[in-house]
Amino acid sequence: MEPIEQQLTELRTTLRHHEYLYHVMDAPEIPDAEYDRLMRELRELEAQRPDLITPDSPTQRVGAAPLTAFNQIRHEVPMLSLDNVFDEESFLAFNKRVQDRLKSTENVIWCCELKLDGLAVSILYENGVLVSAATRGDGTTGEDITSNVRTIRAIPLKLHGDNIPARLEVRGEVFLPQAGFEKINEDARRTGGKVFANPRNAAAGSLRQLDPRITAKRPLTFFCYGVGILEGGELPDTHLGRLLQFKAWGLPVSDRVTLCDSPQAVLDFYRNVEKDRPTLGFDIDGVVIKVNSLALQEQLGFVARAPRWAVAFKFPAQEQMTFVRDVEFQVGRTGAITPVARLEPVQVAGVLVSNATLHNADEIEQLGLRIGDKVVIRRAGDVIPQVVNVVLSERPEETRPIVFPTHCPVCGSDVERVEGEAVTRCTGGLICGAQRKESLKHFVSRRAMDVDGMGDKIIDQLVEREYVHTPADLFRLTAGKLTGLDRMGPKSAQNVVNALEKAKATTFARFLYALGIREVGEATAAGLAAYFGTLEALQTATIDELQKVPDVGIVVATHVFNFFAEESNRDVIGQLLAEGVHWPAPVVINVQEIDSPFAGKTVVLTGSLSQMSRDDAKARLAALGAKVAGSVSKKTDLVIAGEAAGSKLAKAQELGITVIDEAEMIRLLGA
């Protein structure tokens, strides 16, 4: 694997993790600014190597998957997100792209609004009556929050006025005013309840309560900003006109909406809002800029995950200066050693900040950072800030260098840094308590073995008390042993035991992902499972054979080969199987016996499909003997191009690979 491929893999893994924490768990770990930085870095790398763009890349999707505690609602019209710009130059470039696509030299009329920092929701009215509401979820499927939305007084249960459409789906943001947020936290501190980090987390946590009575006690509000379904009625042909119509029907709309007839007017609006931001009474993180004309919006269309006619112009993350008092080193699941700066506590955006991640040794070297330095930290509404730069002009005399450990700070094992990698790793494996904790947390996670109720704090205690050393030990736990843990009663303990028993029935792909093999994410695990079919075949595969799996290169193949070559890993797998972990036997597909134009072909999907989901398409293609890959190469036999197909289509045309559209794919699927 080339260095850029490894960078892409690590970036995608990190972004997916933080998308899950942000969109699903409502517990983000990093500021929006840091997420945006990672996303920009990923986009830039993918622009350099478009042939390495994969369908599951965070740049190709909208959000994260919904929880299963709520019923699911499928969005008839996908809830897309917006692309971001961060400075005047980027906005002016966006403005020019719009004018170029419209083939116009005249100024576009923009409708400018506030970018609210809450939770995006969809609300469906039928004949003017509220019938359902859902979160964005992954943009295609969200959570049914109808009962909770009904408790928000700002949202009308019945629209009033004339010419209300038979079916109208409005979209907007549920948020918590700062006064309400402060009262919730004040009450929580007094009663010993949960204190929220910021209004956005409080709004999300309030809206996604399983008990609507709790939601009803929270002072949530709502602003409408768009439309999804529109049937049996009409709306004005401008965005501003639609907002005014929504307001006439009783839907709340922000009064901070302005038409701008030039890029300069947009910039003026942006600056004025930024200046007024502290006095608004609720959190925003930028402004949203939309082409006002619906006809021009239709002409501009969409890319895979966002409209071409709108952009979010984000505010710079808020910054403060403080001192680095010390640097500690944390060890992750794969042994990665991450330096963490311990800061002189400082208030940033209303939150007391005392820690900042420093990523790796290269980051420290690039910053020129020393312990004792005065630094600028940046934070954008969430928890972990970043160190932006060192204030060299105010460097104290008593600073000292940051020395990376030569031995693991947890287990004492040697550390290594592979040439070409930025990460320093502990070599201790499962003898390292830190790696053991993180490996076990990964093993039981929702996308892996999905052990309900087995949270991080339980894993921490199990490792610290030496009840559990390997994943197999989890399945030997009894309710009696679990009852001895903090905050774990007999009923909760039995629920965990039951969840562990249920988790034994899994899939081969989930099992592989749960093992935590380096570089093997969900997509790679699924590819390995589909290609080899059985654990025995995978365990005995050579590095060359592993590379025959779509999207598996030399680096991933080597990690997989080395994992199964390690006797201790094979022993743990044997114990897991002995404890009853199992999955359905593979359905053997003899490609020679399949009468399908896709049999034996390596196929790549690109662009948006309108007749079925991408996952459905992959499943149907695989059932007909195709190998579905994530990137175009000389090994690719066929590319299926949906709407807004981009770099993969261009690469296929460059290589002379056969390309068909979605309609032809559907015809051939039925052949």
From Swiss-Prot:
Give the source's domain of life in one word: Bacteria
**Active site, renumbered:** K115 (n6-amp-lysine intermediate)
Query: Which SUPFAM superfamilies does the UniProt entry name for this protein?
Result: BRCT domain (SSF52113), DNA ligase/mRNA capping enzyme, catalytic domain (SSF56091), Nucleic acid-binding proteins (SSF50249), RuvA domain 2-like (SSF47781)
Against InterPro entries, the record matches this protein to: BRCT_dom (IPR001357), BRCT_dom_sf (IPR036420), DisA/LigA_HHH (IPR041663), DNA_ligase (IPR001679), DNA_ligase_AS (IPR018239), DNA_ligase_CS (IPR033136), DNAligase_adenylation (IPR013839), DNAligase_N (IPR013840)
The cross-references to Pfam families, in alphabetical order and at most eight, read:
BRCT, DNA_ligase_aden, DNA_ligase_OB, DNA_ligase_ZBD, HHH_2, HHH_5, Nlig-Ia
* Keywords recorded for this protein, A-Z: DNA damage, DNA repair, DNA replication, Ligase, Magnesium, Manganese, Metal-binding, NAD, Zinc
Q: List each copy of the BRCT domain by range.
A: 593-671
**An MF annotation (GO) of this entry:** DNA binding
Which catalytic reaction applies to this protein?
A: NAD(+) + (deoxyribonucleotide)n-3'-hydroxyl + 5'-phospho-(deoxyribonucleotide)m = (deoxyribonucleotide)n+m + AMP + beta-nicotinamide D-nucleotide
Binding-site residues for NAD(+), renumbered to this chain: D32, A33, E34, Y35, D36, S81, L82, E113, R136, E173, K290, K314
Under the heading CDD domains, the entry gives: BRCT_DNA_ligase_like (cd17748), LIGANc (cd00114)
Q: Which co-factors does it depend on?
A: Mg(2+); Mn(2+)
Q: Which GO terms describe its biological process?
A: DNA repair; DNA replication
EC numbers listed for it are 6.5.1.2
PANTHER family in UniProt = CHROMOSOME TRANSMISSION FIDELITY FACTOR 18 (PTHR23389), DNA LIGASE (PTHR23389:SF9)
Q: Which NCBIfam families match?
A: dnlj (TIGR00575), PRK07956.1 (NF005932)
Give the protein family. Belongs to the NAD-dependent DNA ligase family. LigA subfamily.
Entry protein name: DNA ligase
Recorded name of the encoding gene: ligA
